[in-house]
């Protein structure tokens, strides 16, 4: 079930005009040799996937996506989804869908293709290429939307070093600082495990150790959702019993 404030962001989002006004001066100040193009997009919550980002990528292109906004299931009850879960991407028509773990993300294209964006909830994916498994009319039940900036860096740009340098200037927009922090301090997924693709990547689970030094997985979630999985080569036969326990600290 959708949980209250799924995005985990307690602050109020900017509107689309404020979003652009905050980021445009920063974009104008970037050296011309760094970026090969950018575009702003507004994704209304009522728009079913997919939205054409208008950018054709080639293998090796680095792209940064910054987003803000909320898609509401119920405004009176303050039930909404933020960009960390709501904003999905796809390169080309048939490649696997993916999302970031926060309201900001940077990724490298693995193949040529047009970049597409999607406001996901209340939909569910029918397959990994982003075909919907829910009726289109479900999108009429939500409101709000997402403001998105897509920025493509020139080939050869060291994006990690670039954001590290950008973070030294506290005058840059908050979303830029947030992406610098995410790049500089990523949350690793436990080795041999992966997030279930239908819900997307996350920062919920991380490798850890028990008090006596045994390998463990730490689970910490706030306004997020995700399922971790791995292959278990165990034959399921009559009599096979699976058991597990949960611990929740507040």
What are these model-predicted stretches?
Residues 2-212, 216-250:
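Gly-Asp-aromatic-enriched flexible segments
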């Amino acid at each position: 079930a959708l949980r209250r404030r799924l995005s985990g962001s307690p602050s109020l989002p900017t509107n689309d005009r404020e979003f652009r006004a905050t980021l445009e001066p920063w974009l104008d100040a970037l050296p011309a040799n760094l970026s090969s193009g950018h575009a702003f997009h507004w994704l209304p919550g009522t728009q079913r996937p997919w939205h054409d980002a208008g950018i054709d990528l080639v293998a090796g292109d680095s792209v940064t996506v910054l987003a803000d906004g909320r898609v509401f299931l119920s405004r009176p009850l303050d039930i909404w989804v933020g960009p960390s879960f709501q904003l999905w991407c796809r390169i080309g028509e048939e490649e696997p869908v993916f999302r970031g773990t926060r309201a900001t993300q940077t990724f490298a294209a693995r193949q040529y293709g047009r970049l597409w964006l999607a406001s996901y909830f209340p939909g569910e994916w029918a397959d990994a290429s982003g075909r919907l498994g829910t009726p289109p009319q479900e999108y009429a039940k939500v409101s709000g939307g997402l403001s998105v900036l897509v920025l493509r860096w020139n080939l050869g740009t060291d994006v990690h070093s670039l954001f590290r340098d950008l973070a030294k200037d506290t005058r840059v927009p908050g979303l830029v600082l947030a992406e610098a922090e995410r790049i500089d301090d990523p949350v690793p997924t436990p080795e041999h495990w992966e997030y279930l693709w239908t819900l997307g990547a996350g920062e919920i689970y991380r490798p850890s150790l028990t008090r006596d030094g045994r390998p463990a997985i730490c689970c910490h979630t706030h306004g997020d959702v995700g399922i971790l999985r791995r292959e278990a080569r165990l034959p399921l036969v009559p009599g096979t019993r699976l058991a597990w326990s949960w611990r929740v600290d507040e």
